[in-house]
Swiss-Prot record:
This is Small G protein signaling modulator 3. Belongs to the small G protein signaling modulator family. Residues 480-539 form the SH3 domain. GO terms for biological process: plasma membrane to endosome transport; positive regulation of GTPase activity; positive regulation of protein catabolic process; Rap protein signal transduction; regulation of cell cycle; regulation of Rab protein signal transduction. The keyword Electron transport does not apply. It is found in: Cytoplasm. It comes from the Eukaryota. The keyword Cell wall biogenesis/degradation does not apply. May play a cooperative role in NF2-mediated growth suppression of cells. The gene is SGSM3. PROSITE patterns: RUN (PS50826), SH3 (PS50002), TBC_RABGAP (PS50086). It comes from Homo sapiens. Widely expressed.
Length: 749
């Protein structure tokens, strides 16, 4: 066929042969034979060009230079593959090369120097892990296409609208009759079917179209699968775009670190960089750089993953940093930033600058920042996340295609994570809603019982700044230096120098010089009273309220132990790994014990942290430094000591610990401590659990509301009452009365 061949560097020559538009090639041949000028010219990638474009002074040098394969570079690649697989030259064929290539510095240097274009389809599949996915999949691409062909969903309709918008200047996708359009439709519909929680995103369309230019349809699909599941974080292409939004925050953090002058400029002009760079990341540069540069970027991207997106973006910004700094106004800066990708013409220069500037950036550093900023982003939005959304934060979930395990297998080895995810994530929104309602009920109780709490703001603060203030507020002790006590019994006033009070009255202590008789004030009167008739209040960081005292207001006990504690327990039980058939107990208390111990041990192991604690955290009554971690550890130990003595159940222990956290106003900080103990959380919880998802930050913000109220809850409220002799109290009072008659009391202290 006359149109079946295209010369090197000629139209469509860089594309996979199966996507060559034969009708256009046939017309080219006819025009050449008749010496007529063709209606349009196309480059080797199928993009429409104008013959005189190369003569224009503003045209791109990169666009006008033909794609030439470097013969020595191809030989180096062949030598590496032969050496790695120990084959003779004549025996080396792609079917004999492993589905994944062993990673090494040599391989990385080859990738960085560029993959020979003719080897890209096979090497991309191996570097990205797509070939492994293709061979291991239980469903073939043909079956996936068949299942998705009749899928008349919203995603399918949107795909149909965007087919001609994706790459209109390319002959393979220019019209509904173009050869690439049916391929793109099948790939996008297959992806939307396989990843129902993602559906369709325009970013996937651009990436898929570029892949289809160089790979066969099935291989392009599995490349997209590798990008979605492995190379990019979860939620990159979801409706919320949480993944790519998070990466924009990570990018701003990296700019502060690597390009401080540019960071200062962006802050001075109040420029939101994500408005420009989000599209770069969403399409992996497919829609913003020249196709020749894109090939070099993707060589590295498929080998090293999403870290490359940050490195190259930093490199681009660095190359234009001086021009940006010299810009006169915000509009000029914004326009310059927007034009940066299209002005990148030297691939070697860009890659060299990017690696010199940010080559030290590691996946661990990127993932650490992602985890933090994703959690803050979710909390900042202040939204109740649905089950599907929360699921997609930790991993991309495929449509279930595996057969269900047998009952015996499930008992011995547990259910599949996906099966458990499907069954349990349905209630996530309900769990958060139940907790929020429990918190509001407690808050309304305080406002109704004690009017001074009416001004407390009950709307959670989801801002990033709120997390920074948490520890500052924890460190700050009570600004009121009053020492107060609560009356345990009625004390009737008989003399002018005595202070009478009723049970549960709050007395301001003036003097504690005597062991038995203290001096205090109540309602403007000052006098002495029996010390054993009162209980000193812990008001280091709060002001006592009868609404939170379970010895005065019984209703608070029902609200806390009967409503709030079960709601919190349900969250801690969500995704808790169940024991095997021969396993032991499974309860959130066991996780809390282990996490508290691990965190406090980590602090003790750090000499530096011990040195700065005195400047960072408040002191307890003994003058000892207590971090939130240490306070949690002590509380757990205290609960164990008192509750084990009466063989209390773990449910009771958990409720008592929550009461201690409310008393100390640190319940939200304790949740942060527990969820930050990653090894322990991963040991006890499934990947889809609430505590392993960034959703815990939202719960922390909800719990923070409770630290605005003063609780005085008994840790041992559910334990059997102890029989205490009343004689010591009477003897103490008798001693006090003797002293009163023998000595003259100075009630002025």
């Amino acid at each position: 066929m006359s149109g079946s061949h295209t010369p090197a560097c000629g139209p469509f020559s860089a594309l996979t042969p199966s996507i060559w538009p034969q009708e256009i090639l046939a017309k080219y041949t006819q025009k050449e034979e008749s010496a007529e000028q063709p209606e349009f010219y196309y480059d080797e990638f199928g993009f429409r060009v104008y013959k005189e474009e190369g003569d224009e002074p503003g045209s791109s040098l990169l666009a006008n230079s033909p794609l030439m394969e470097d013969a020595p570079q191809r030989l180096r690649w062949q030598a590496h593959l032969e050496f790695t697989h120990n084959h003779d030259v004549g025996d080396l064929t792609w079917d004999k090369i492993a589905v994944s290539l062993p990673r090494s510095e040599k391989l990385r240097s080859l990738v960085l120097a560029g993959i020979p274009h003719g080897m890209r389809p096979q090497l991309w599949m191996r570097l990205s892990g797509a070939l492994q996915k293709k061979r291991n999949s239980e469903l073939s691409y043909r079956e996936i296409v068949k299942n998705s062909s009749n899928d008349e969903t919203i995603a399918a309709k949107q795909i149909e609208k965007d087919l001609l918008r994706t790459m209109p200047s390319n002959a393979c996708f220019a019209s509904m009759g173009s050869i690439g359009v049916p391929r793109l439709r099948r790939v996008l519909r297959a992806l939307a079917w396989l990843y129902p929680e993602i559906g369709y995103c325009q970013g996937t369309g651009m990436v898929a179209a570029c892949l289809l230019l160089f790979l066969e349809e099935e291989d392009a699909f599995w490349m997209m699968s590798a990008i979605i599941e492995d190379l990019l974080p979860a939620s990159y292409f979801s409706t919320t775009l949480l993944g790519v939004q998070t990466d924009q925050r990570v990018l701003r953090h990296l700019i502060v670190q690597y390009l401080p002058r540019l960071d200062k400029l962006l802050q001075e002009h109040d420029i939101e960089l994500s408005l420009i760079t989000l599209h770069w990341f969403l399409t992996a540069f497919a829609s913003v750089v020249d196709i020749k540069l894109l090939l070099r970027i993707w060589d590295l991207f498929f080998y090293e993953g999403s870290r490359v997106l940050f490195q190259l973006t930093l490199g681009m910004l660095h190359l234009k940093e001086e021009e940006l700094i010299q810009s006169e106004n915000s509009a000029s800066i914004f326009n310059t930033l927007s034009d940066i990708p299209s002005q990148m013409e030297d691939a070697e220069l860009l890659l060299g600058v990017a690696m010199r500037l940010a080559g030290s950036l590691t996946d661990v550093a990127v993932e650490t920042q992602r985890r933090k900023h994703l959690a803050y982003l979710i909390a900042d939005q202040g939204q109740l996340l649905g089950a599907g959304t929360l699921t997609n934060l930790s991993q991309v979930v495929r449509r279930r295609t595996q057969r269900r395990k047998s009952t015996i297998t499930a008992l011995l080895f547990g259910e599949d994570d996906l099966e458990a995810l499907k069954a349990k994530n349905i209630k996530q929104t309900e769990l958060v809603a139940d907790l929020r309602e429990a918190i509001l009920r407690v808050a309304r109780h305080f406002q109704c019982t004690d009017p001074k709490n009416c001004s407390v703001e009950l709307t959670p603060d989801y801002s990033m700044e709120s997390h920074q203030r948490d520890h500052e507020n924890y460190v700050a002790c009570s600004r009121s230096h009053r020492r107060r006590a609560k009356a345990l019994l009625d004390f009737e006033r008989h003399d002018d120098d005595e202070l009478g009070f009723r049970k549960n009255d709050i007395i301001t202590i003036v003097s504690q010089k005597d062991e038995h008789c203290w001096v205090g004030e109540l309602n403007g009167l000052r006098g002495w009273f029996p010390a054993k008739f009162v209980e000193v209040l812990d008001e280091r960081s709060k002001e006592y309220s009868i609404a939170g005292d379970d010895s005065v207001t019984e209703g608070v006990t029902d609200l806390v132990r009967g409503t709030l504690c079960p709601a919190l327990k349900a969250l801690f039980e969500h995704g808790l790994k169940k024991p095997s058939l021969l396993g032991g107990a499974c309860h959130p208390w066991l996780f809390i014990e282990e996490a508290a111990g691990r965190e406090v041990e980590r602090d003790f192991a750090s000499v530096y942290s011990r040195l700065v604690l005195c400047k960072t955290f408040r002191l307890d009554e003994d003058g000892k430094v207590l971090t939130p971690e240490e306070l949690l550890y002590r509380a757990v130990q205290s609960v164990n000591v008192t509750h084990d003595a009466v063989h209390a159940q773990m449910d009771v222990k958990l409720r008592s610990l929550i009461c201690v956290g409310l008393n100390e106003q640190v319940l939200h900080l304790w949740l942060e401590v527990l969820c930050s103990s990653l090894p322990t959380v991963e040991k006890w919880y499934q990947p889809w659990s609430f505590l392993r998802s960034p959703g815990w930050v939202q719960i922390k913000c909800e719990l923070r509301v409770l630290c605005c109220f003063a609780f005085s809850l008994s840790q041992d409220w559910e334990l059997p009452a102890k029989r205490e002799a009343q004689q010591p109290l009477k003897e103490g009072v008798r001693d006090m009365l003797v002293k009163h008659h023998l000595f003259s009391w100075d009630v002025d202290g």
